[in-house]
């Protein structure tokens, strides 16, 4: 009857409300915990800077000294408060167990061919870092690099992996303790034996090989002392020839005030014909230069001399270059130009901008 149905509906709503209140109670941390937190007192210094005649106080300048005992003590005190709160959250274990269950499945990347081997990344489910495997001629897979074994505490990670033209040599960068300052290790890709001393003090860098002779990488002059907070605003592009000491690496770009950029990257085209150099002063917008690697001592030729767009090389076919750009095209387009006259006035649309984002 209608009355019976109505009573059943009301009973269902009542049970639902009780369950929601129960779940809310279980999922909400105790409010008393947050009200009882005693935050460490942060000392205020007396540093004052003057910019354009105006005095600007900077009372926490002392925290920029990341190597000082006082800063270390401040960090320990902050961590004690933070983890003191996090550790008492009643449903923290439930969250961890749920995430563990969701993440616990095998993950395998797309394969890629280098030399005589086919490489791929694999994670058995709960490994902190993906492992690099390889196979040869359909044989059994073997581990090539396992970043989980790079350090005892597991804080050293694999950042970049790149192979020489014939796949016989590999260069990979590692980050220790989460630092942006990295080392590049060079190994025989067949035997996995280290070939030379690692390159050190490398930061915000890719690895782009020129044939089998060496590779381009980027870094800053490493500051002394406060590595974690010192200003790094002049990136430099170098070429490392295999067998040479790092101090002999050739500076390609970024060494002068006119070439000053916060970020500089170098990319060698697949046919080893051109080096493409991209420079940025922020995280958006880049200028662009090109160098013919087949001509000894060839000059750097400007493609773009401003930062009004994000423009990147897709590929080249002989001397014809293909760029993806948003220059005067917010939805992006693909343009083509000959490397002999690569400036923007010579660009031709290959795929024009449309109402859809490319």
What residues fall within each predicted segment?
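Beta-propeller folds
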Residues: 5-8, 17-358
């Amino acid at each position: 009857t209608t009355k019976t149905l109505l009573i059943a509906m009301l009973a269902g709503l009542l049970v639902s409300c009780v369950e929601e209140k129960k779940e809310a109670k279980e999922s909400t941390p105790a409010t008393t915990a947050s009200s009882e937190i005693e935050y460490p007192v942060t000392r205020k210094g007396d540093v004052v800077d003057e910019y354009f005649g105006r005095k600007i106080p900077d009372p926490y300048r002392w925290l920029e000294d990341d190597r000082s005992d006082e800063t270390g003590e401040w960090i320990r005190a902050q961590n004690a408060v933070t983890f003191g709160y996090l550790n008492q959250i009643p449903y923290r274990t439930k969250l961890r167990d749920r995430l563990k269950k969701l993440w616990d499945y095998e993950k395998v990347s797309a394969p890629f061919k280098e030399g005589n081997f086919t490489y791929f990344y694999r994670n058995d489910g709960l490994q902190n870092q993906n492992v690099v495997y390889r196979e040869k001629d359909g044989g059994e897979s073997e581990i090539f690099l396992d970043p989980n074994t790079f350090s005892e505490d597991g804080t050293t990670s694999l950042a970049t992996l790149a192979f020489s033209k014939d796949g016989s040599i590999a260069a990979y960068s590692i980050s220790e303790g989460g630092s942006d300052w990295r080392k590049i290790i060079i190994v025989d890709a067949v035997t996995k034996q280290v070939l030379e001393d690692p390159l050190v003090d490398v930061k915000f860098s890719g690895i782009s090989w020129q044939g089998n002779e060496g590779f381009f990488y980027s870094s800053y002059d490493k500051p002394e002392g406060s590595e974690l907070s010192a200003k790094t605003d002049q990136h430099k592009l170098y070429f490392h020839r295999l067998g040479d000491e790092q101090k002999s690496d050739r500076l390609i770009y970024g060494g002068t005030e006119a070439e000053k950029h916060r970020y500089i990257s170098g990319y060698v085209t697949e046919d080893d014909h051109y080096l493409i150099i991209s420079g940025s002063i922020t995280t958006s917008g880049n200028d662009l230069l090109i160098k013919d690697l087949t001509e000894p001592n060839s000059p750097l030729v400007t493609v773009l001399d401003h930062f009004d767009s994000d423009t990147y090389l897709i590929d080249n076919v002989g001397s014809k270059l293909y760029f993806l750009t948003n220059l005067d095209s917010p939805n992006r387009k693909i343009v083509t130009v000959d490397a002999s006259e690569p400036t923007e006035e010579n660009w031709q649309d290959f795929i024009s901008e449309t109402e859809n984002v490319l």
